[in-house]
Amino acid sequence: MFFTISTHKMSSIADRNDGSIFDGLVEEDDKDKAKRVSRNKSEKKRRDQFNVLIKELGSMLPGNARKMDKSTVLQKSIDFLRKHKEITAQSDASEIRQDWKPTFLSNEEFTQLMLEALDGFFLAIMTDGNIIYVSESVTPLLEHLPSDLVDQSVFNFIPEGEHSEIYKILSSHLLESDSLTPEYLKSKNQLEFCCHMLRGTIDPKEQPTYEYVKFIGNFKCLNNVPNSAHNGFEGTIQRSHRPSYEDKVCFIATVRLATPQFIKEMCTVEEPNEEFTSRHSLEWKFLFLDHRAPPIIGYLPFEVLGTSGYDYYHVDDLDNLAKCHEHLMQYGKGKSCYYRFLTKGQQWIWLQTHYYITYHQWNSRPEFIVCTHTVVSYAEVRAERRRELGIEESLPEIKADKSQDSGSDNHINTVSLKEALERFDTSPTPSASSRSSRKSSHTAVSDHSSTPTKMTVDTSTPPRQSLSAHEKSTQRRSSLSSQSLSSQSLGQPVTQPTMSQPATLQLQSSMSQPVFQFSAQLGAMQHLKDQLEQRTRMIEANIHRQQEELRKIQEQLQIVHGQGLQLSSGPCVPKIHRTDVTVPEMFLQQSTSGLNFSSVQLTSGNSSSVQQLAPGNMQGQVVQTNQTQSGMNTGHTSTPHMIQQQPLQSSASQHNQQNVLSGHGQQSSLAGQSQNTVSTPLYNTMVISQPTAGNVVQVPSSLPQNNNQNAAAVTTFTQDRQIRFSQGQQLVTKLVTAPVACGAVMVPSTMFMGQVVTAYPTFAAQQQQPQTLPVTQQQQQQQQQSQQDQQQQQQQLTAVQQPAQPQLTQHPQQFLQTSRLLHGNQSAQLILSAAFPLQQSTFTQSHHQQHQPQQQQLSRHRTDKMTDPSKAQPQ
């Protein structure tokens, strides 16, 4: 029984173990299934991504359009990478590590600099020798403009002996027709040869000069060459008969000079009308240079200041510049010719200068020269030089104009291979006449405004032209608005000389535009001529006016020095045909702007030979000064006066010069009309001719008491030797002179009064102390002449001639200042002035006295007039 129970227990345990094992297996299967599903998903994702990459890589492989399996794609990719690795290794071996091009330069600028450094230029030639492109660097090297070479045959610029060799070199690739494929053109086919090229000249008649050059280049296949006409004519071969690559193959070369140039001519103008300003001395040395000059000429201002402009000019231009500068010094302004200026980079640049002379604002003397320099191109220079030489483009040629733009694609003209071969077979070496004709025509003047290209026809080849092509070329030329030229050409034999073709070519349109430009230039020249003539007339008028003033000053000096009394301004100079004249005492009274010499008479001792004098005019200047002395304000104002001089009667009587003389009964009266109650001193000036130089003239305000002869004349003086005047009484001064020989009595104009300066005391000062106005001798006058010049701008005087020589007591308180009176043994001329300040009251008086034969009666008569003013009233 125990065994049975144990067996039963063991069976139950076994069943229980089997169930647990099954459950565990189920769980493990579930886990494995989940893992497998997850792994399958990731594997599928990886395969999909791999297929996508293989497909993309297969699409990038060239050559096969069919579908490739994965292994093929991978194999070709491996081959490409291997080849690329080899190419990279080769490139790294031949690569130059140094960076040649600076970062601040563009490709065009760097190319231009490299060409200048190599003394070379780019040239593109078709297989037949037609030039389709040339760089601008050809101008400083060969003196050709790019427009002179484009669309021309290269054989026109090569000596005849080298034509066949050059043509064989250019056509050498034609022998290998099998290899003439785009792949061959892209491969290495470098070609080098040397030859001579013609240098350009301004005058086509000059002897041709050739430069030895070297061509280094290769053939290129151009895909963008337009199917344009060659020299304005369409080819005769149909386009279908030509190879597809024929007119798109050209020889691109770098042409270098065998002998480098140390100083080159820089003719490329980057920006038109570039200019800068400078200032020069009259010796043409730099005084100033503005900020625009360094980018153009390379010099900084401090590098050229003080140097002569002639140090920078070309030796061939010195003669023309010297003539231009002479014209500048003659006319004051002008325009220079075209000349070459040496820059700091040792290159010649063409300039034209407009200059003018500036003058000092005070003395009008030439100070310096202001110049405005403008940069010009070689095309303008050559056109101007040819116009000066009178060269006209009259040779038989057909011109077609094109507009060239550096930023646009170059217009390339081609010709068929058959035409080139015919030309080579017919005339491999053009004649001398043909070459000279081409030489004279390839340097045609180009219009710088539209930059047209001059195209000519090779005269050794019969031109071919259709009507439609002629119409197209005519429309193209008219649309470009350049020189309108059309021509007709007739078939000529190939062997016919070039000089026989002018009859076959005719100009059909007039040169309207050049005529218009010439008219505009002629009008500008005429306008400039009119301005110069007007300026010349103004300068001549100024010179005449200055000469007239100088003549007047010379006459004034002659009057002062006694070399002849002549008046240049004024209606008349009165003359007295008496030798001995004495002027009587003068009576002054107040007046306004008008004073009349009603009757000024000069009577001789015997009362005979009276001659009337013509009236003269005299004007004064206005001088205002205010002086206050002893509480009295006296305004010294000299207003303009018009003095009418009436007929004068002359008389003379002579006395000894050593005695004190008095007037001999001669009189002159002044009649004035008072219009304003203004206190104005009158300046009366007398011109006196004296035969000797030792005379002293005194104008006393108080006469000496010890003079017995004039005892009656001082009865009104007080003990303190002061003259007393009443409120309404006028001031009377007696002037006594000695009889002298006088040839003329003159009332000069005010222009001479600048040489006379006097010192005037006020009326208050005259009442305090006696005054004597002596004229010092020559030594004292010269010492005080400097004081006279300072006062002559403040006072203006008038003069009346009168001989005088009193000998009175001298009181050196105040002196009468004169200029240039007594000089050596010459006849002295004395200008006296006496100013008498009047009280601020109106005096309306006129005096007329009778001639007294004796001195006592005259003195008594003068005393009565001073004491009793009623006697001085006009009768």
UniProtKB/Swiss-Prot annotation:
<feature type="region of interest" description="Disordered">
    <location>
        <begin position="842"/>
        <end position="875"/>
    </location>
</feature>
<dbReference type="GO" id="GO:0006473">
    <property type="term" value="P:protein acetylation"/>
</dbReference>
<keyword id="KW-0805">Transcription regulation</keyword>
<dbReference type="InterPro" id="IPR047230">
    <property type="entry name" value="CLOCK-like"/>
</dbReference>
<dbReference type="Pfam" id="PF00010">
    <property type="entry name" value="HLH"/>
</dbReference>
<dbReference type="Pfam" id="PF14598">
    <property type="entry name" value="PAS_11"/>
</dbReference>
<dbReference type="GO" id="GO:0006974">
    <property type="term" value="P:DNA damage response"/>
</dbReference>
<dbReference type="GO" id="GO:0051775">
    <property type="term" value="P:response to redox state"/>
</dbReference>
<feature type="site" description="Interaction with E-box DNA">
    <location>
        <position position="43"/>
    </location>
</feature>
<feature type="site" description="Interaction with E-box DNA">
    <location>
        <position position="47"/>
    </location>
</feature>
<feature type="short sequence motif" description="Nuclear localization signal">
    <location>
        <begin position="32"/>
        <end position="47"/>
    </location>
</feature>
<feature type="modified residue" description="Phosphoserine">
    <location>
        <position position="408"/>
    </location>
</feature>
<keyword id="KW-0539">Nucleus</keyword>
<keyword id="KW-0804">Transcription</keyword>
<feature type="region of interest" description="Disordered">
    <location>
        <begin position="420"/>
        <end position="507"/>
    </location>
</feature>
<feature type="modified residue" description="Phosphoserine; by GSK3-beta">
    <location>
        <position position="427"/>
    </location>
</feature>
<dbReference type="GO" id="GO:0006357">
    <property type="term" value="P:regulation of transcription by RNA polymerase II"/>
</dbReference>
<feature type="site" description="Interaction with E-box DNA">
    <location>
        <position position="39"/>
    </location>
</feature>
<keyword id="KW-0677">Repeat</keyword>
<feature type="modified residue" description="Phosphoserine">
    <location>
        <position position="38"/>
    </location>
</feature>
<keyword id="KW-0090">Biological rhythms</keyword>
<feature type="modified residue" description="Phosphoserine">
    <location>
        <position position="42"/>
    </location>
</feature>
<comment type="subunit">
    <text>Component of the circadian clock oscillator which includes the CRY proteins, CLOCK or NPAS2, BMAL1 or BMAL2, CSNK1D and/or CSNK1E, TIMELESS and the PER proteins. Forms a heterodimer with BMAL1. The CLOCK-BMAL1 heterodimer is required for E-box-dependent transactivation, for CLOCK nuclear translocation and degradation, and for phosphorylation of both CLOCK and BMAL1. Interaction with PER and CRY proteins requires translocation to the nucleus. Interaction of the CLOCK-BMAL1 heterodimer with PER or CRY inhibits transcription activation. Interacts with BMAL2.</text>
</comment>
<feature type="compositionally biased region" description="Low complexity">
    <location>
        <begin position="842"/>
        <end position="857"/>
    </location>
</feature>
<dbReference type="GO" id="GO:0070888">
    <property type="term" value="F:E-box binding"/>
</dbReference>
<dbReference type="InterPro" id="IPR000014">
    <property type="entry name" value="PAS"/>
</dbReference>
<feature type="domain" description="PAC">
    <location>
        <begin position="336"/>
        <end position="379"/>
    </location>
</feature>
<feature type="region of interest" description="Disordered">
    <location>
        <begin position="794"/>
        <end position="813"/>
    </location>
</feature>
<dbReference type="GO" id="GO:0003677">
    <property type="term" value="F:DNA binding"/>
</dbReference>
<feature type="site" description="Important for interaction with BMAL1">
    <location>
        <position position="84"/>
    </location>
</feature>
<feature type="cross-link" description="Glycyl lysine isopeptide (Lys-Gly) (interchain with G-Cter in SUMO1)">
    <location>
        <position position="67"/>
    </location>
</feature>
<dbReference type="GO" id="GO:0000981">
    <property type="term" value="F:DNA-binding transcription factor activity, RNA polymerase II-specific"/>
</dbReference>
<keyword id="KW-0963">Cytoplasm</keyword>
<dbReference type="GO" id="GO:0000978">
    <property type="term" value="F:RNA polymerase II cis-regulatory region sequence-specific DNA binding"/>
</dbReference>
<feature type="compositionally biased region" description="Low complexity">
    <location>
        <begin position="476"/>
        <end position="490"/>
    </location>
</feature>
<protein>
    <recommendedName>
        <fullName>Circadian locomoter output cycles protein kaput</fullName>
    </recommendedName>
</protein>
<feature type="cross-link" description="Glycyl lysine isopeptide (Lys-Gly) (interchain with G-Cter in SUMO1)">
    <location>
        <position position="871"/>
    </location>
</feature>
<feature type="region of interest" description="Implicated in the circadian rhythmicity">
    <location>
        <begin position="516"/>
        <end position="566"/>
    </location>
</feature>
<comment type="function">
    <text>Transcriptional activator which forms a core component of the circadian clock. The circadian clock, an internal time-keeping system, regulates various physiological processes through the generation of approximately 24 hour circadian rhythms in gene expression, which are translated into rhythms in metabolism and behavior. It is derived from the Latin roots 'circa' (about) and 'diem' (day) and acts as an important regulator of a wide array of physiological functions including metabolism, sleep, body temperature, blood pressure, endocrine, immune, cardiovascular, and renal function.</text>
</comment>
<feature type="domain" description="PAS 1">
    <location>
        <begin position="107"/>
        <end position="177"/>
    </location>
</feature>
<keyword id="KW-0597">Phosphoprotein</keyword>
<keyword id="KW-0010">Activator</keyword>
